[in-house]
Amino acid sequence: FPQDAYDYWHPLYELAHQLDPQNRPVTLVCCQNDYTKDITTRTMDIVCINRYYGWYNLSGDLDNAAYAFKKELDFWETIDKPLILSEYGADTVAGMHGFAPEMFTEEFQVEYYRTINGCLDERRFVVGEWPWNFADFSTQQGPMRVGSCNRKGLFTRERTPKLAAHYFRDRWGKKEPNDR
């Protein structure tokens, strides 16, 4: 499988560079796969990864999620290319609170982002982060989606901010670029 992906994507990568007179960077997103066997993503100009440590992987265990994510970041750092965490998040039911940050509470979503962002902030090669998602959105019904809704938004479907929206306002509102 990794070789088949490379054989498909790498010629497109080369063609994009060949056709672009401005020589803009080319990337693709590495989803929840075995990153150590991925031979395609590492050939791109920018490494983009979608990761859900602490949510789908190591669900609710933020300490071990941070450990696993740091281990993966160690791997990507050896590739010597800029990295963007292109998708990450935790479902949150707006208005659901708890004394401890348990999954689906607004407090957990904030702790999730603090944990993952703490890992990112330690790495100079990380050049961006894209939380999933701006706002909750409708999805196909199923056992993982209460009310047929993906609730990873920083805002509700009605655009009411969750606690995480305030967290990111503070995070992104800092003046210095390295003052993450």
Regions from the PLM with identified roles:
Residues 1-3:
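Active-site groove signature of glycoside hydrolases
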Residues 6-180:
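Substrate-binding clefts and catalytic carboxylate motifs of secreted carbohydrate-active enzymes
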